[in-house]
Amino acid sequence: MVLFIILAILVVILIAIGVLFYMRSNKRNLIEKTEERKNEIEQLPLDDNLRKLTGLNLKGETKTKYDAMKKDNTETTNKYLAPVEEKIQNAEELLEKFKFTAAQTEIDDAHELMDQYEENYQHQVTQVDDIINLHKENEALYEKCKVDYREMKRDVLANRHQFGEAAEPLENEIENYEPKLNEYENLKSEGNYVQAHNHIAALEDQIKNLKSYMDEIPELIRETQKELPGQFQDLKYGCRDLKVEGYDLDHVKVDGTIQSLKTELSFVEPMISRLELDEANNKLENINDKLDEMYDLIEYEVKAKNEVEETKDIITDDLFKAKDMNYTLQTEIEYVRENYYINESDAQSVRQFENEIQSLISVYDDILKETSKSAVRYSEVQDNLQYLEDHVSVINKEQDKLQNHLIQLREDEAEAEDNLLRVQSKKEEVYRRLLASNLTSVPERFIIMKNEIDNEVREVNEQFRERPIHVKQLKDKVAKIVIQMNTFEDEANDVLVNAVYAEKLIQYGNRYRKDHHHVDKSLNEAERLFKNNRYKRAIEIAEEALESVEPGITKHIEEQVIKE
């Protein structure tokens, strides 16, 4: 037994030793990979990358930057790469002692150092590339500025006439660029690449702005010397022609405004010669705005004349229509008021319209006289005609409404008479149905309702014979009688249906009298109520009795009555 225990312990020990050696083997692989990475990092061309700057002019800012980066290289190597070998050796020694955790810590530290080394290397690559690219950009801008400088100089020399008095200031500005180009060369030769970049970039912007000025100046000069003076002349002679045609353009003040604009225009060329183009553009914009205002006023007058010619015919027709309609209304009112009641306000409105129409005709005659003058301000004429058109339109609408009212009086009277005849006919028809029904007698309330309708009809007929008729009152009374008639008919129909239904229920219930005492008793009561014209109560008692012996039968009987 002891032997087995000893053997088991030995097996466990052997397994533990095997595991330890296996773990050490894995860690040794990690150390080998760390060693391989160190070798790869040592191959990074840190110094070779920095040597790219030696092709530049190593002075000034470039030299300072180069020295700083070279110093950083040394510090990076000493601080991050040199300790890596020591970390790897420490890890190997700890691994031999089976101190796996401590060995792993050394390996991790080694990787962190190499990560930082690689990061510094990439940062240096970026810095070197930025410096080289900035030098290239500086050279490209410099070459562009030189080309632009020569072209601008030739352009002013060859096309001096296009620039007018601005040619000399342009030449002076262009000549100022030569020392600035030389200044760039000095900064470059001194190795101050950042200052050189700022200088050449600013110079490129200045040249670009001056080139845009050179493109703009000929256009401004042409507008100042030719286009605007030509527009002044065209506007002046155009207004003279329009005045000959009969336009009153005194309110436009063409001559005075043009003279004022000429004075303003005289300040523009000196501004251009001083290269004050923003101020020159503002001045020209102001001149053009004032020209547009005058053109708008003149165009408004021309359009106003056309509208006046179109509106005159319309207003003439509208005034004639208003006058004719007013005469017709006065005649109709005198005729109609013999038969119908007319509000005095309507008659007064017609007389007021007559005065207004006459006043509008007088105003219209004055306007026509105004248009026959040698000089006419058509915008004012148009405003006056618009007022006339609006006013006469209102009068025509009101007079049309009044005429429709007079026509409606006759139609309303005829409609009221027709409705009254229908009421009389319908009343007699309903009463005949009541008399011919199975009712023991016509209920008293229907006799009362019939008499009330007869009385109302007689009163209305009396009013129809009176003159003048108050149509609205008649129409309202007839409408009230129609409502009474509808109520009379609806209630009569209800009574007739209830009477038939009650009779059917009693007749059907007779079959149960012998065998069901309570049915016989209830039907006797229903018959009594029927004779007293209390049909609804008779129905309730008969329904209750029949439902007690034959459920659902009353519904069936009711449906049959409705169908009949």
Swiss-Prot record:
Residues 24-564 are cytoplasmic. GO terms for biological process: division septum assembly; septin ring assembly. It comes from the Bacteria. Residues 1-4 are extracellular. It is found in: Cell membrane. Keywords: Cell cycle, Cell division, Cell membrane, Coiled coil, Membrane, Septation, Transmembrane, Transmembrane helix. It is a single-pass membrane protein. The keyword Metal-binding does not apply. The chain crosses the membrane at residues 5-23. GO terms for cellular component: plasma membrane; septin ring. Residues 84-126, 165-223, 271-303, 350-435 form a coiled coil. The keyword Repeat does not apply. Negative regulator of FtsZ ring formation; modulates the frequency and position of FtsZ ring formation. Inhibits FtsZ ring formation at polar sites. Interacts either with FtsZ or with one of its binding partners to promote depolymerization. NCBIfam families: PRK04778.1-6. Belongs to the EzrA family. This is Septation ring formation regulator EzrA.
